[in-house]
Amino acid sequence: MPVVWPTLLDLSRDECKRILRKLELEAYAGVISALRAQGDLTKDKKELLGELTRVLSISTERHRAEVRRAVNDERLTTIAHHMSGPNSSSEWSIEGRRLVPLMPRLVPQTAFTVMANAVANATAHQNASLPLPAETANKEVVVCYSYTSTTSTPPSASAPSSSSAAVKSPRPASPASNVVVLPSGSTVYVKSVSCSDEDEKPRKRRRTSSSSSSPVLLKEVPKVAVTAPGPKTITLPVSGGPKISNLMQSIANSLPPHMSPVKITFTKPSTQTTNTTTQKVIIVTTSPSSNFVPNILSKSHNYAAVSKLVSSAALTASSQKQTMVISAGGSSVAPGPGPVAVTTVVSSTPSVVMSTVAQAGSAAVKVASTRLPSPKALIGSPSQILQIPKAQQAVLQSAAPKALQGSISTAQSTALAAAGPGAKPTIQIKQESGVKIITQQMQPSKILPKPSSAALPSSSSAPIMVVSSNGAIMTTKLVSTPTGSASTYTRPTVSPMGTRVATSPAGATYVKTTSGSIITVVPKALATLGGKIITTSMVSGTTTKITTIPMTSKPNVIVVQKTTGKGTTIQGLPGKNVVTTLLNAGGEKTLQAIPGAKPAIITASRPITKMIVTQPKSLGAGVQPSTTTKIIPTKIVYGQQGKTQVLIKPKPMAFQTAVVSEQTRQLVSETLQQVNRSAENNTTSTHTSAAAAGLENRDDTHTYTEGSPVPSDSTHDAPPVVHLISSRGQEWAEQEVSVESSPALIYQELTAESQSATSTIKALLELQQTSVKEKSEAKPRQHTIDLSQMAVPIPVSAEQRESPEPSGQSAAESDAHTEFIPIGKVSKAAEVSASSTPGQSASAVSAAPHVVKISTAAVTTQQVEAQVKPQQEQVLVEECELEGDTLDPQTGLFYRSSPQQQLSRVCEAASSSSSSSSSSSRRAEPPLTVKILTHRSSSSAPATAASANTPHTPQLPRLQQAPTTHNRPNTHTQLSQPPPLQAHHPVGSSKTSSGAQVQQPIITQGATVTKITFGAPHVPRAPVSSSSSSEAALKLQAESSSEKPSVPDILKISMMEAEIDPGAEPMLVDSSSDCGPLTKAPAGPSLISSSKQTLAHGPFSRKSKELDIIQVIPQYSIMPDSSQSNVVVEPSGFLEISDYTSQRLDEEQAMEQEVDSSNDEGAAASPSADQSQ
């Protein structure tokens, strides 16, 4: 025959050798597989294989490895089982044994071990609630990708979602096809394409009325919704196709492990406004076009149907124009994917979504959060998670689109208390089972530094916060509506177009806007921790920040406020005290207290907004809201009805920090300075009006300290701020109580050493330089007064009484929290989340600590990146974690004597350059705090060094030496003491005043010896936590906090946080009166030291506020853990707040995003701050 093709190919000898070897190996492997499938190894087969090994040049090791492969192949094993019966692998197993057995290896210890363990524990906990893999073998996994084109109509949208054949969908059009092509081009094999069945079973509520088959369909907005048949739903908006594919890919990669059946709905941004979404998903959009709002929004936000987001099934696909009204009542044109940004995140179990719509005219922000229980660890409430979405979804939005409205919906109870629409700001509070989100937006946008978005005169951008608990990804997007009221979020408006959401399922999810403002960063670990997510939105890279930290089981309250208008109103929920303070550009502060909320939040005048989140989940109906503190740019808000909340902002991720950090820092520093001045001016004048005027409260802090009677009431209110910390516990109410008590102590310490704190903050430094020394000397008495006041209110507080119940949990969970929080400290959000996680899973303290560590590590890592002090951060984190291990679980403080000392030394070295004494004292605190101190001292050193150093300089050495030793020992002592103290707590509350008083002077003395004070307060704190310590502590904190707020603004409050921390801690100690006296000498100094350190830190932290925040957060975290521990953490947290006040704002936002979890203030409030902390 003629040769049709060449018989010799262009192959070199080497190539031929390689191909031959491949053929030989494949042939041998094929023979082994065939013989294995026939049955057990016989003598004949063995001889045949021996011959083949020689012919094919197979080594003995290769032969044994192939045999092991065949033996371990379930497919071959199954075939052999059917062909030759059971027990057909014994000889094969013998033949496949290794000549040299593998040596057992030690478990490697790396920097990520703690994080990995925490994640593994969290995942194991979640998986424990899932069916065994064997039980799911025959179940269909549904992955639906709906890629709807922009032109698809709502009906068509519903069709594509059901058929999962979208116009543009790359996936095969036939619903029966087994392959789904992701937009990114990757393919997913699915057993069944129909998403509806899977979804209906797990969550009928999620089903949208319009389309049963589509879990989430968002037409208007580019969105990615991933819904697990379980309670997990993740929806991510994507502005661009490629981004969508990336999101899709990341979601697909990350979600599958956590959710068994995963439903992914990918919707390309479409002009259609109708969205069919499962109830769980709440979409918040501020879109130029009124029809843009997804029906979910329309339904939930629908003014006419204000309350019906509750039932998922009830969710109507039809989008309401009314919702549109909110976005831009006037604009009917859909800007397309660019202008509209919608982010919805539903966590696997709990789904929490915050929606904010900025109206053109009224710049209204609406937030709807579905219950935020973390799916696995929530002790609350698997059932709640399922139920709540429906009930919680209901959002009351009573205001007309033009009038900003705060609408509050409680997940559990439909009862919503809608405060009258605020003058300009609109506040929406939604309480989900685990999370309460309050969004407040002011119409006028004094905040926005750039009117760049002014370009869109009609677009007003409102931050969108998505909170998911339990590993849900949270994204915050700033979207601008093409409305006349672009004032507030002008810059964000630009960002909506340029927003891009990058989500790594496990990693941080952040949305970045073209304008450069940072939207959200959610650290993976935090998200994974479950129940903790922090979303931070910075508007025009300045003051607007939205942070939500969903607690796994306890509700979080997130208040997002923008200072757009002159008047700011805070709305509270009926039965729950929510205090929100907005800082107006004008500097006006209007506080709307919820009935029962005693303290008003005080805000310093500044265009920066302040957010406070307070929510009692179950604790004292409205009286004790477990609060998530929102960090306010340059402002701290204290005072929630019985709890004091400290707003701590976590430092933003490195990338975020870079973008907004400078501007924010400037704003913060300016604000701080202003606050300082006002504080100085107002210090004497307004301690009484602490509740009344947020700004003045700060200033009044000093006065408050002096005038203890008035502050007591205020303080009571203030404790809610502290409360946030405690809210970290799984039972928000209960844990909050325990945490609260710690924060209360902190606040007192701050109050006592408010001057120190002030010095910490630059403005405070100035204010305090004059008064720091005076107050440091006189402060002890003031502290004492404060403490006593606090003590008095504590016993009086109903919260306190409630707190005993929680305190019981708190005692048990508090320990978990403490361990958990230290890492959480890094990000308050993490902390809160951690706290809540432990609380939720009363199951495992150990697990909680792991989680906390994870969040800390993640937060720290991110924060460090932001701070550019990763090493220090990591060290801090590690130390924190290690220390946590070292310390008793009760204290929850992770202190390592050597690491801590090193850290303090390092911090001192760092701060020595700027302000050695103040930094060292701060550093002396906990390692985390120490590091932060160093950074802070670098930035604030000049201003703070003088004021802080003077009072603290002598103490610094002590702090350094003692912090490690005292702090450590104190911590240990406290740790050992906490249980008794906790048991003693109820009694302690009355004693608190005396103990606190005693300790306060100590604190004052130990202004430099912050560490020592820390230790002592911690012990008292734990006791407080245990009985009604959280309540009492919170109350104390609230009291101190109210007092402190009166002093200087945020600065003072920050200072108060720092100082009050010690003071508050002592107060907590007071609560556990034993603690106060017992740890009095050591504790007092310790507390003082911590507050002083915090104060010193405040200024320094401005520069290195990110680190500071992180460090502080661990301390903060620690505090929640045990009342005493909490105390320790809180002081730093407060300090961080101070820092946050000035510079930390950015960081906090970033942190919050990371943690986003919000609680810690992180949850949006400071969840992130603390969350990030």
UniProtKB/Swiss-Prot annotation:
The protein's predominant localisation is nucleus
The cellular location(s) given in this protein's UniProt record come to: Nucleus
Q: Name one GO biological process term.
A: DNA repair
**Low complexity compositional bias: what residue ranges?**
149-177, 683-693, 911-921, 937-953, 1025-1040
Provide the Gene Ontology terms for cellular component.
nucleoplasm
Compositionally biased residues, Acidic residues: 1148-1159
In terms of superkingdom, the source organism counts as Eukaryota
The record's annotation in SMART domains points to: ENT
**Per the record, where are the segments of Polar residues compositional bias?**
961-976, 989-998
Q: Where is the ENT domain?
A: 16-100
Write the record's keywords in alphabetical order, separated by commas.
Chromatin regulator, DNA damage, DNA repair, Nucleus, Repressor, Transcription, Transcription regulation
Region described as Disordered:
149-179, 191-216, 676-720, 797-816, 905-998, 1020-1046, 1139-1173
Record's keyword annotation contains Transcription regulation? yes
Summarize the protein's role: Regulator which is able to repress transcription, possibly via its interaction with a multiprotein chromatin remodeling complex that modifies the chromatin.
PANTHER family reported in the protein's UniProt record:
BRCA2-INTERACTING TRANSCRIPTIONAL REPRESSOR EMSY (PTHR16500:SF3)
How is the subunit organization of this protein annotated in UniProt? Homodimer.
Q: What is this protein called?
A: BRCA2-interacting transcriptional repressor EMSY
